[in-house]
Amino acid sequence: MARITVEDCQERVDNRFLLVQMAIKRVHQYREGYEPLVESRNKEVVTALREIAAGKVLPDDDALYTPPAEQAAAVNEG
């Protein structure tokens, strides 16, 4: 599987500090029993970053989220 980078995640969430908070929150959720939203055999933090990059995990404030291009086009059309 390809490597995940902060830049991949910043396509969805601009703020690096928010990105770190989201990843930490997601890791805590895994430890509470939540299931990952993407298939991954990586460590928890890498799985959390993969979820963020895939747009599966959103910040609490939707204004801070940049949807994938195809999703944004569908919203603008509808």
From Swiss-Prot:
The keyword Nucleotidyltransferase applies. The keyword Transcription applies. It catalyses: RNA(n) + a ribonucleoside 5'-triphosphate = RNA(n+1) + diphosphate. SUPFAM superfamilies: RPB6/omega subunit-like (SSF63562). Its EC number is 2.7.7.6. Gene3D superfamilies: 3.90.940.10. It holds the Pfam family RNA_pol_Rpb6. GO terms for molecular function: DNA binding; DNA-directed RNA polymerase activity. GO terms for biological process: DNA-templated transcription. Belongs to the RNA polymerase subunit omega family. This is DNA-directed RNA polymerase subunit omega. It comes from Desulfovibrio desulfuricans (strain ATCC 27774 / DSM 6949 / MB). The gene is rpoZ.
